[in-house]
Each structure stands twice: as structure tokens, then as C-alpha cells.
Amino acid sequence: MSRAARVALSVVVAIATALAGYALADARNAGATTALGPGLVTVTVDVHYSKFSLEELHVHAGTTVRFLIHNNDPIRHEFIVGDAQVQALHEKGTHPAHPPVPGEVTVAPGDVGETFYHFDEVGRVLFACHLPGHLAYGMHGWVTVSRR
């Protein structure tokens, strides 16, 4: 292969790699602009200074989301996804920690937690941290579920 061909191939590979990285970053940060699913999708949520990096997520009905929660804070947090009844139970402080229940996870400082939630019905679903004062501080967001 000639030197010019090797240079051209290197440029094409570099551009393709950059575009692939951009596409991956876009999927990770889709948030409010792109409806994900249906099927299984993974969404990463970082916690820093008692704030979720994700404020809003759009999915299609029939989507199961695997939430990966990276707790970068020096304190414990939780990530609870669910309807008003689920949120009300947790706001009353009924659970000090969360066993493996779909849509619920407690994450220790510096740790990564995982939970799955299947979105069937069109509407809005809240996610929040209900540890004392965290919800009022702004640790919450919404998942908007739309028809496919």
C-alpha cells in the first residue's frame, strides 16, 4: 500500500472512530431529546453534589431501562423509580436500604448501583432520592413514556 493510501486510510479510521464516540456519547446523554427503546437500554446516571446528572428521560412504551447509578458523593443515595404510591411510601422513610426490587436501589458512597424498570404505560414516571432532605434539594427527575 502506498504512503498516500495509508494516510487516507488513517484519516478515514480516525473519522469513523470519532463519529462512533460521538454516537455513543449521544446515546448516553439522550435525555430529553431522544426517545429510547423499545427493548432493553442502559442509562447511566451520575450523582455529584447530591444531584442526578439526568433530569429528564424519554422512552417508548415497552422499554426496559437498566439504570446504572454512579454515586460520586461521600454520602449514601437512593434511586427510586415508580408511581405516586411508590414515591409516597419512600418519602415516609419506610426502607433504610433497598433490597433488589425493580426500580429501587441504594448506592453507597463511591459505589455503582443497578436497577431495572420496565415502562409499559404512556405518561410520566418520577425518579427520586428520598433520603432526608434530598428530594427537597432537587434529587429527582422524570421519565416520559410515549407510544412507539
Where are the predicted features?
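N-terminal Sec-pathway targeting helices
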Residues: 1-10
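Hydrophobic membrane-insertion alpha-helices, especially the h-region
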Residues: 10-21
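Extracellular/periplasmic metallocenter environments
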Residues: 21-22, 26-30, 102-148
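N-terminal edge beta-strand
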Residues: 35-64
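Asparagine-centered strand-capping/turn motif at beta-strand->loop junctions
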Residues: 69-71
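Extended, low-complexity, turn-rich repeat/linker tracts enriched in Gly/Pro/Ser/Thr and Asp/Glu
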Residues: 73-76
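Beta-strand signatures of extracellular beta-sandwich domains
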Residues: 78-82
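Short aromatic-acidic-glycine turn motif
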Residues: 85-95
